[in-house]
């Protein structure tokens, strides 16, 4: 009996020693995290207006930038807002699919699946861009080009969902023929405009860069939201009782707020150096855009549930399949545009270094 107790105590002693060594093991396994640096210690390309500190140094190993997810720096809120939003979209859709016994192969479900895919894509591309862009100048351009591809994919995924699930009959009768082709073109134009502006203009950025970004994206938004805006306006004029229409209303409002903070560097413009880690405009843009996407998701799930009969009356399997194939065509065109401009950037950087 005594021997058994001594053996057990010996085992516990070894386990205790291992536990005491655990922090050291974890520390050795993680990369050494360099301190963040002020704007004067990073190249001009990485500097943001009115953001004085919190920059990650360039030129380190990839794992440093991945592990900077847990470091305090001026991009970490941008990363976490879209990471949490992506997880929320995924979990909400999974719960909906389980509760509704979603028919995955049904024609009726295809636009919904593409909308979910597009939402996860844009959120993931965005968080990767903000997490990894500090590695080098080429990485900076590459990941922001990927971000712009994600935005174009999300724009068209939203257009598909709005067209198939959310449009009312009066709007549909007038615009059904050219809405999706125009939405696909505007989605590509948004990606091309953002990529070109990133490639063409250097910091400090001129106003023309913002125009190249905002105008195509604004046109895409106006077109993509038109079926929803028309339905919401009619609903509110008639004393709206539709729950989905209220979610669509929130979607529009949150997007407009996010667009303001994307276009204007506030509040950091009025408090330079005070909003470096938390509170600058791009972080607020990310937060409101995430809430916009979650509101949009709720509205589309309600439309998917409640308007199936309208869907079946309007759309045959062939038209739905063709529209869904165009989603992947748009993604390929946007990716090709980004790859072309990345090639030009790489050639320019190589020439500069030689």
From Swiss-Prot:
<feature type="transmembrane region" description="Helical; Name=7">
    <location>
        <begin position="320"/>
        <end position="340"/>
    </location>
</feature>
<feature type="topological domain" description="Cytoplasmic">
    <location>
        <begin position="133"/>
        <end position="174"/>
    </location>
</feature>
<comment type="function">
    <text>Plasma membrane progesterone (P4) receptor coupled to G proteins. Seems to act through a G(i) mediated pathway. May be involved in oocyte maturation. Also binds dehydroepiandrosterone (DHEA), pregnanolone, pregnenolone and allopregnanolone.</text>
</comment>
<feature type="topological domain" description="Extracellular">
    <location>
        <begin position="341"/>
        <end position="354"/>
    </location>
</feature>
<feature type="topological domain" description="Cytoplasmic">
    <location>
        <begin position="305"/>
        <end position="319"/>
    </location>
</feature>
<protein>
    <recommendedName>
        <fullName>Membrane progestin receptor beta</fullName>
    </recommendedName>
</protein>
<feature type="transmembrane region" description="Helical; Name=6">
    <location>
        <begin position="284"/>
        <end position="304"/>
    </location>
</feature>
<dbReference type="InterPro" id="IPR004254">
    <property type="entry name" value="AdipoR/HlyIII-related"/>
</dbReference>
<keyword id="KW-0472">Membrane</keyword>
<keyword id="KW-1003">Cell membrane</keyword>
<feature type="transmembrane region" description="Helical; Name=2">
    <location>
        <begin position="112"/>
        <end position="132"/>
    </location>
</feature>
<feature type="topological domain" description="Cytoplasmic">
    <location>
        <begin position="235"/>
        <end position="243"/>
    </location>
</feature>
<feature type="transmembrane region" description="Helical; Name=1">
    <location>
        <begin position="76"/>
        <end position="96"/>
    </location>
</feature>
<keyword id="KW-0812">Transmembrane</keyword>
<keyword id="KW-0446">Lipid-binding</keyword>
<feature type="topological domain" description="Extracellular">
    <location>
        <begin position="265"/>
        <end position="283"/>
    </location>
</feature>
<feature type="topological domain" description="Extracellular">
    <location>
        <begin position="97"/>
        <end position="111"/>
    </location>
</feature>
<feature type="transmembrane region" description="Helical; Name=5">
    <location>
        <begin position="244"/>
        <end position="264"/>
    </location>
</feature>
<dbReference type="GO" id="GO:0005794">
    <property type="term" value="C:Golgi apparatus"/>
</dbReference>
<dbReference type="GO" id="GO:0003707">
    <property type="term" value="F:nuclear steroid receptor activity"/>
</dbReference>
<feature type="transmembrane region" description="Helical; Name=4">
    <location>
        <begin position="214"/>
        <end position="234"/>
    </location>
</feature>
<keyword id="KW-0221">Differentiation</keyword>
<dbReference type="GO" id="GO:0048477">
    <property type="term" value="P:oogenesis"/>
</dbReference>
<comment type="similarity">
    <text>Belongs to the ADIPOR family.</text>
</comment>
<keyword id="KW-0675">Receptor</keyword>
<dbReference type="Pfam" id="PF03006">
    <property type="entry name" value="HlyIII"/>
</dbReference>
<dbReference type="GO" id="GO:0005886">
    <property type="term" value="C:plasma membrane"/>
</dbReference>
<keyword id="KW-0754">Steroid-binding</keyword>
<dbReference type="GO" id="GO:0048545">
    <property type="term" value="P:response to steroid hormone"/>
</dbReference>
<dbReference type="GO" id="GO:0005496">
    <property type="term" value="F:steroid binding"/>
</dbReference>
<keyword id="KW-1133">Transmembrane helix</keyword>
<feature type="transmembrane region" description="Helical; Name=3">
    <location>
        <begin position="175"/>
        <end position="195"/>
    </location>
</feature>
<keyword id="KW-0896">Oogenesis</keyword>
<feature type="topological domain" description="Cytoplasmic">
    <location>
        <begin position="1"/>
        <end position="75"/>
    </location>
</feature>
<feature type="topological domain" description="Extracellular">
    <location>
        <begin position="196"/>
        <end position="213"/>
    </location>
</feature>
<keyword id="KW-0217">Developmental protein</keyword>
